[in-house]
Amino acid sequence: MAGSLAALAALATLTGTPALAQDKSMDEIAKYREMLADGNPAELIEMRGEELWKTPRGPKNVSLEQCDLGLGPGKVEGAYAQLPRYFADAGKVMDVEARLVYCMQTQQGFSFAEATKNWYSKPGKESDLVALVTWVGAQSNGQKINVPVKHPKEAEMVKMGEYIFHRRSGPQDFGCSVCHGQDGVRIRLQDLDNLSQSKGAQKAMRTWPAYRVSQGTVWTMQRRLIDCMRQARWPEQKFPSDAVIALEMYLQNKAAGGVLESPGIKR
């Protein structure tokens, strides 16, 4: 807590003209993130996710310990690093959230509406699904992103995601690539990674899910992308969104080889 307050104080004291203060601002923001990462609040949500994974729940009163996240029933370590991927039992490509919802339905007996009712966290109201994603993601910490593209439907989703990334749409004629398709782009004090290149994609994708300080809770990658689409004034995506999963697939494929540091921490 003391470190967080010190970091906020440092951030608040930035002065000078925008041009002269720019580099100093980014240095202070980097220090701020370092201080916060030392006691990432996401760790508490991660612990809750593990408990939810192991606790019998739902109409069938069973746990999720036999849920297959792509590496076999109950195998969690390294699974997040290889998602999204194609699942034969569902006949489609799924990311971690879509797969957990599937397991909650098929194994625990929850309805789709019940499993997705609170799919994202709000300040003071944590989502069970987000907690599960946070824990699953943490089990791939230190592993390289390695999304499979062997199945035709996986390759199809990568192409679809690439199309969505570069498509300009909506009343503002806006798209992902406007902000994230070139080097040196910034919004206010926020440097924007070039996600069309491997280096930028690795840097961005390796720290999700992440605790967002400005929101006071953990955001998943699907939540982040859905919100990006909202900000671009695109049609609202219904969770879990195949379009968003395709975009995730494209970005994770671009980020191949990046080492996960999950859960991360963001502004």
Regions from the language model: what does each represent?
Residues 162-166:
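Short secondary-structure capping micro-motifs at structural edges
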Residues 21-44, 54-69, 73-131, 141-142, ...:
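Electron-transfer interface patches adjacent to heme c in soluble/periplasmic c-type cytochromes
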Residues 132-139, 148-149:
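Hydrophobic, well-structured mid-protein blocks that either form specific transmembrane helices
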Residues 3-15:
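Bacterial N-terminal signal peptides
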Residues 143-160:
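Solvent-exposed, charged amphipathic helical/linker segments at domain boundaries
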Residues 44-45, 156:
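An amphipathic alpha-helix/helix-turn recognition signal
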Residues 15-21:
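Sec/Tat signal peptide C-region and signal peptidase I cleavage site
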